[in-house]
């Protein structure tokens, strides 16, 4: 129970469609190092805490990677998907404290993978409703649409 622990790709092997394998492994090392400092001479407890902390994030990076694969495979040529991304970008530029695009959350913040996945799913539900707006392709950059997104937050 206290003689070995898996970190990096051996602990959370995933498809390569988010490019986060090495980053996730470095994060494992940082967190494990902090836990070693806290759990002096109690490796079993250290390993248990590490697993409790990292398992949800290993699952999160897997979910994010599979989602990104599906997006790259199925959606990048879809005009409605591209419009949705333009709307999200505009809202994020106007209200960066209220909306961080999923890719930016994962790649440029310290938000955990599991939390980014949850927030990304919430954002997707909001955008699903926004994209159902009549004539969204004509009014996408209007204040009305920005207020609609804000009202869901």
Labelled PLM ranges:
Residues 34-153:
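C-terminal helical "tail/cap" subdomain of flavin- and related membrane-associated enzymes
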Residues 1-42:
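FAD/FMN-dependent oxidoreductases across multiple families
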């Amino acid at each position: 129970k206290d003689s070995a622990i898996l970190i990096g790709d051996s602990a959370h092997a995933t498809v390569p469609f988010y490019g986060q394998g090495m980053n996730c492994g470095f994060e494992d090392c940082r967190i494990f190092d902090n836990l070693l400092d806290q759990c002096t001479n109690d490796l079993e407890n250290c390993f248990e805490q590490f697993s409790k902390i990292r398992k949800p994030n290993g699952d999160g990076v897997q979910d994010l990677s599979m989602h990104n694969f599906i997006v790259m495979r199925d959606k990048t040529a879809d005009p409605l998907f591209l419009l949705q991304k333009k709307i999200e970008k505009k809202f994020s530029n106007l209200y960066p404290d209220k909306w961080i695009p999923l890719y930016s959350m994962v790649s440029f913040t310290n938000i955990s993978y599991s939390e980014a996945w949850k927030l990304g799913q919430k954002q997707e539900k909001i955008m699903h409703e926004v994209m159902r707006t009549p004539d969204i392709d004509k009014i996408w950059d209007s204040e009305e649409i920005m207020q609609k997104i804000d009202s869901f937050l």
